[in-house]
Amino acid sequence: MAETQTTTPKKKAERRAPPPARARKNRPAAPAPGPHASLSYLRVAPRKVRIVADEVRGMKVGDALAMLKYTPQSAAKPLAKLLRSAVANAEQGGGRVDVDALFVKTLTVDQGPKMRRFMARAMGRAFRVEKKTSHVYVELGTAARG
């Protein structure tokens, strides 16, 4: 009589949890951000938004809004709206905030996705047109009075 061998079914390899993150040595924790606002997928090229953003960075909010009101670039209107949103977030944040003391602490402009389109040209050709978008982030700070 032939002996039948019984095999045990193979177990699937169990996944291990990743090792815990190492604590950073001698580095303070990142400070909590102040009042901030962000704008995603702005349909203006980042290069053009940065021209306006460089003028506004570091200014008091009231002065920045006044300047943006009379700036002819297409990015000025959305940036002014973003600043007003950040001021509203500062007022809504719970603590008493002096709106006159707020200034633009950080203002970053990053590139968003490009929308690729084609423009018909002569003799059956087509040129690619890239419609660029921007992501804008603004954080406000309070000027220390002294």
From Swiss-Prot:
Entry keyword Cytoplasm: no
MF GO annotations: rRNA binding; structural constituent of ribosome
Keyword Membrane: no
InterPro entries for this protein: Ribosomal_uL22 (IPR001063), Ribosomal_uL22_bac/chlpt-type (IPR005727), Ribosomal_uL22_bac/org-type (IPR047867), Ribosomal_uL22_CS (IPR018260), Ribosomal_uL22_sf (IPR036394)
Disulphide-bridged cysteine pairs: none
Keywords: Ribonucleoprotein, Ribosomal protein, RNA-binding, rRNA-binding
Assigned GO CC terms: cytosolic large ribosomal subunit
Entries under PROSITE patterns matching the protein: RIBOSOMAL_L22
Record GO biological process: translation
CDD domains: Ribosomal_L22
Region described as Disordered: 1-39
Coiled coil: none
Family classification: Belongs to the universal ribosomal protein uL22 family.
Function: This protein binds specifically to 23S rRNA; its binding is stimulated by other ribosomal proteins, e.g. L4, L17, and L20. It is important during the early stages of 50S assembly. It makes multiple contacts with different domains of the 23S rRNA in the assembled 50S subunit and ribosome.
Subunit structure and binding partners: Part of the 50S ribosomal subunit.
Protein name in the entry: Large ribosomal subunit protein uL22
Organism listed in the record: Anaeromyxobacter dehalogenans (strain 2CP-C)
